[in-house]
Amino acid sequence: MKMLNKLAGYLLPIMVLLNVAPCLGQVVASNETLYQVVKEVKPGGLVQIADGTYKDVQLIVSNSGKSGLPITIKALNPGKVFFTGDAKVELRGEHLILEGIWFKDGNRAIQAWKSHGPGLVAIYGSYNRITACVFDCFDEANSAYITTSLTEDGKVPQHCRIDHCSFTDKITFDQVINLNNTARAIKDGSVGGPAMYHRVDHCFFSNPQKPGNAGGGIRIGYYRNDIGRCLVDSNLFMRQDSEAEIITSKSQENVYYGNTYLNCQGTMNFRHGDHQVAINNFYIGNDQRFGYGGMFVWGSRHVIACNYFELSETIKSRGNAALYLNPGAMASEHALAFDMLIANNAFINVNGYAIHFNPLDERRKEYCAANRLKFETPHQLMLKGNLFFKDKPYVYPFFKDDYFIAGKNSWTGNVALGVEKGIPVNISANRSAYKPVKIKDIQPIEGIALDLNALISKGITGKPLSWDEVRPYWLKEMPGTYALTARLSADRAAKFKAVIKRNKEH
């Protein structure tokens, strides 16, 4: 009996250790060990990467976790694990989490990468998550930083999340994030890709301006018949200047909620795809160094509600406004903006028009004439409970409406104070009487758990986001220089010039 008790005394710690060890995960310290471990890891497994620089890491994860038992691959000490050189990550399994990695000092083969291809991190499987990672001026190869990409047999990843990541000083072409459900734009009128149901939240974007249509912060889908159903919320775009489109939303039924756009030289665009929602976003320009933007809207059946616009300068090339409503032909490449709700928004001291009802109209007329399409101006607009206010000596009236479009639309419960309206519509000048209107007929977006009617009826809530509210939990200071200075460092500026020159030559 004494022998058995003694044996049990030895075995018990060993059994405890065996049971606890899987919870602690495996710690890897080389590329080769990382590759081997991810081939063997099971659902619920944890792979921790030791501090260090992992040059030329080619991490391809094909194993899958399960609902409630994801496979997690993370930095042992977030911020002290660097993926550099000819790096790439492919998440081909499902229920995978990548956490706490810093992507920097890359040198991928320029010829091997291209815009609209897989990203530096390419997500091929569903239910995957990228969290608390940093992407800072990675290299000179044109690609997105993160993509959801179709598999070789055309399967579309769904229900993925990108959160609490920082994307700074990107000097290459293509968007920062591309969410794809087709391989290319489908323009024959047929239904595009299936719904994606992704979420991008609590991320930070700040990237320098590039020539042409070079790739903004986020693209969702390719064309108007794709179904997005993605939620983009609680992100901070601070000098996200890559191109004229901060976000290019090219699919249906996406929701943009609670984001902050600070000093961005572009607009948040409903570019293709009807029935999209923008609620409680903040569009702010607080200096006069550049022209800053709000929203540019194409398409129909949108909801634009409870957004706050305060722009110290506006974008001359687009028509100097906070909200642009596109004229043109219905359901075309430059689709007419019509049949939508614009409610409970605040336009405060916009150094431009609050709403431009016919931006770029001459260009749109030329396009319609060349393609034998009917040119129309925005109509069937329901403008309810909006506040227009100026107490600064800006020269613009509230509205730019060269065709008196406003007369074709519905105006209810709006208040305008401070300057001329610019159009002969009945809007109250009694600010004390202002209150948000109640909304009750907006249908929810499938797969997005937001009560749209309740959110809109509250009016604008909260305040603009700050760096501390979106940053990776382990990162105290903003990477790079562009966010705070609107300039790249000298060495990054030189690399940027080389990228632009190379792109022109090819």
UniProtKB/Swiss-Prot annotation:
Record key words, sorted? Glycoprotein, Lyase, Pyrrolidone carboxylic acid, Signal
* InterPro entries linked to this entry: Pectin_lyas_fold (IPR012334), Pectin_lyase_fold/virulence (IPR011050), PL-6 (IPR039513)
Q: Which residues does UniProt mark as catalytic?
A: 250, 272, 333
Where Pyrrolidone carboxylic acid occurs, the residues are 26
- Positions glycosylated per UniProt: 234
Q: Which GO terms describe its molecular function?
A: chondroitin B lyase activity
Task: List the catalytic activities from the record.
Answer: Eliminative cleavage of dermatan sulfate containing (1->4)-beta-D-hexosaminyl and (1->3)-beta-D-glucurosonyl or (1->3)-alpha-L-iduronosyl linkages to disaccharides containing 4-deoxy-beta-D-gluc-4-enuronosyl groups to yield a 4,5-unsaturated dermatan-sulfate disaccharide (DeltaUA-GalNAc-4S)
Q: Name one Pfam family in it.
A: Chondroitinas_B
Task: Give the EC number.
Answer: 4.2.2.19
| Signal sequence interval, chain numbering | 1-25
Q: What does this protein do?
A: Cleaves the glycosaminoglycan, dermatan sulfate.
Report quaternary structure and partners: Monomer.
In which family does this protein belong, per the annotation? Belongs to the polysaccharide lyase 8 family.
The protein in question is named Chondroitinase-B
- What is the protein's species of origin? Pedobacter heparinus (strain ATCC 13125 / DSM 2366 / CIP 104194 / JCM 7457 / NBRC 12017 / NCIMB 9290 / NRRL B-14731 / HIM 762-3)
User: What gene name does this entry carry?
Assistant: cslB
